[in-house]
Amino acid sequence: MYMARCGPKNNVLCFPFQLSFLFSKRLINKRFKYTLQTEDEKNMMGSLSKNKIITPEDVEFKLAQLREFSNTLKERIHNTKSVNSDGHQSNSIAPISEDSRNVNVTKTSSVPNEEKSKNLSDLIHSSFLEKMDHLVPKVIRERVADDDILAKNLFDRSHSNWAPVIDRLYVSEKRFMDIDSREFSVWLNGTVKYLPFHSILHLDEMLLEQINGDVVKFNTHMYECIFNNLGNLKPTNFNQDGTNDKVILKMKELLERYDKALKITEERINKKEGFPSKVPKMTQAILNNCLKYSTKCSSFHDMDYFITKFRDDYGITPNKQNLTTVIQFYSRKEMTKQAWNTFDTMKFLSTKHFPDICTYNTMLRICEKERNFPKALDLFQEIQDHNIKPTTNTYIMMARVLASSSSNAVVSEGKSDSLRLLGWKYLHELEDKNLYRHKKDDLNLFLAMMALAAFDGDIELSRALYYLFIAKKYKTLCANWKGNILVDQDTIWKSTLMPEMLNYLMLAYARFDPRNLPVLSGYEKGIELRRKFLREFDSSMRLDDTDKLVKFKLPFLPISDLNSEAQVLAESNAIWSFNMENGGTRNTLTSSNEAALEDIKKYRQLLDSFAQEAEDFNEFKFKVMYEVTKMQRESINVNVFNKISLHTYLSIPINLKQQKEFLRRLTFFTFQQHEFEAVIKRLYEGYRNIPSSHTRDQNSISTEAISVSKPETTEDLNLIMHDIWYITCLRHKIMMDTTLYELVMKAAIEFQNEDLAKKVWNDRGKFRTTVPFLKMDQRIRIAKDQKFAHLMVEFFTKQGKYSDAIAIILSSKNRFNWTYSMVRNLHKALEEIEDRNSVEILLDVVNKKSHAKALKWEEQELNM
């Protein structure tokens, strides 16, 4: 089948109307016959092997295409200015002779090939110039003097790169000199974006040079262009707090330049030197770019500086966009109280400042963190009352808020199942409305469904959702992968596996209870949705047969329904190891004894070199920690291995009452800071005491050579080997923090293991003396200590050691604010044994103010 390209063309011979129409009519008939003949021949040849024939629908489709081609050609001929005007006015078409046709065809075919080629080149060149004029002014194109740079970096507007163009202008002779600054700056502000920092400096320098250094002429468009590019930059990893950040400093420098311009303008007016034609002004867009970059740096100080500066000096108060940016900053910094205050301010300032759906979605995200479902329901009602159109993310966030709120019986007010059911109904409503979805909405939707299923303990649905999402992402990456799929499996799996999905799957395992029924199984729409996902989940094969090269497997047990604790533990271990080893591309957790021995030999030599090169213990410790971090990145998928997912993974055997499995997981995947310090110090002292003459051969190391070259006893050698193995194993371990110590204490309460409780009490006491704990904010340290003390009280209460529990409360009554909810179980136990004296002491502590509050009250009374 032939395709015709219609439309006006330049440098094409023009025929009279009658002759052109006759040519087109005969050409259509000839092309139609030839097309059908060609298709018949193809089908006859194809029928020998594929048995295909032309259907009436195919013929009708081709006729419709040819009719469209004919109509388009007629319209083009009608709109084209004819050379013979008399021919347009004639209603009858005179027949054309064969000789005339031959003469015209001969004239047409006599055009030289060189002229056709030249016409085509001219057409392409004129098209290039026309498109270039829309991108850059003519004077800029002349000064760049390289059309290849312009075409390569600017033609694709979705991926335009102005940095090479600005850098080329920077090294040119005239730069921006002798260009009208007003028209040029208007074009510049709306076009030049996403420059790197060095190109922004070049642009700023050229703009100042253009106005001969007169800052008064540095107009608003120039300021907006520079600030817009600065606001789009990302802070460096080592300067996330904004301290002495080069971008922040540049922004403040520009504001100082503007202040200087205002001062010069005022002086000129006072001296009657004439008022400038147009004074630059600060705008809301500039303030928003300042706030946008400050929030990226997580710098509250800089954000407050810009808000105060623009409000007091320029009379610009934050608008809706600015305040939304501030709320998003508070949300990221966990400053929820300030976020709610700002949100309330937006609602009562004016209609222009009233929150939009983006602001409401941010507040719903805060509700999820706070597990505040009543407030989320109020926000959704406000959205409906003010006729604000909800987005896909609004419904997703409502489902996630209700899912997180259902995790705790106290928070959910005893209505966990009802909250999860309401969350699913929001997702049903989203499906019915068929709203527009961004690329990230698919991920957020899966996460919302995973959250609802996980908190409900619906393992079957959680497995299906996890499998479907990971499979879709993996196969999409493989389909668009430009390299070798088999060779690049490590990179592909690293991009596929997600920590949030893994955490929700581990949470579903932790909430396993074969007696519970999923909330989705209670109504028809939920049953249909659940069956849909379970039908798509292949729990046995997990292999894409359509492409033998792309194999997709997840280590699920080949059964559709897990019904025992052993199955849950086995599958959770398999999925966890699969994620840690990056889709099975590494064997960190399953190394053989021979490989372990080789690692010990390798790192003994490496640690020896660190000890000999280090000037002191701190340098040796730094080198070891850097090497451990490097080992971890090379052997473990650090994207999914974090404290949150580890906490959930460790909670599975606690909820299933499997003490042995919990201790195994805890030992294998965690280490303690004080133990690490002791091992490092022991290794350093051991290596520094080895004379240089006893240094081992760098090329060959064996167990026999080690034992001969070192004068230590077998016991000392075993200790050294143990310490080296300890360092080697740190690649798959995370340091214990306050949250993990609390989890271990909860395990001791669940298992009623007094030895474990004493051990974690002592270990946490040592952790309190380490640098990581001392670096924490004092209020956070007190809150963590109080929570751990509360767990100790719960442990002694459950063991019936009420005097020990009361002793902890009395010893910390001046430090902690003990509330009744924290001692409820102890109070009930004391009431049962009718220990009136202890009850009175306990209630006296609970009802009294804390020591700090009492002192403050006494001070106020004395002042009065």
UniProtKB/Swiss-Prot annotation:
Subcellular location: Mitochondrion
Organism phylogeny: Eukaryota, Fungi, Dikarya, Ascomycota, Saccharomycotina
Record region (Disordered): 80-117
Entry keyword Mitochondrion: yes
Protein name: Mitochondrial 15S rRNA processing factor CCM1
Keywords: Mitochondrion, mRNA processing, mRNA splicing, Repeat, Transit peptide
Assembly and interaction partners: Binds to mitochondrial small subunit 15S rRNA.
Note: Present with 876 molecules/cell in log phase SD medium.
Biological process, per Gene Ontology: mitochondrial genome maintenance; mitochondrial RNA processing; mitochondrion organization; mRNA processing; positive regulation of rRNA processing; RNA processing; RNA splicing; rRNA metabolic process
NCBIfam families with a match to the protein in the record: PPR
A Pfam family recorded for this sequence: PPR_2
Origin superkingdom: Eukaryota
Example GO molecular function: rRNA binding
Transit peptide interval: 1-76
Sequence ranges of the PPR repeats: 319-353, 356-390
Gene3D superfamilies, A to Z: Tetratricopeptide repeat domain
Free-text function comment from the UniProt entry: Regulates mitochondrial small subunit maturation by controlling 15S rRNA 5'-end processing. Localizes to the 5' precursor of the 15S rRNA in a position that is subsequently occupied by mS47 in the mature yeast mtSSU. Uses structure and sequence-specific RNA recognition, binding to a single-stranded region of the precursor and specifically recognizing bases -6 to -1. The exchange of Ccm1 for mS47 is coupled to the irreversible removal of precursor rRNA that is accompanied by conformational changes of the mitoribosomal proteins uS5m and mS26.
Biased composition, class Polar residues, residue ranges: 80-94, 102-112
Gene Ontology cellular component annotations, sorted alphabetically: mitochondrion
Family, per entry: Belongs to the CCM1 family.
Record-linked InterPro entries: Pentatricopeptide_rpt (IPR002885), TPR-like_helical_dom_sf (IPR011990)
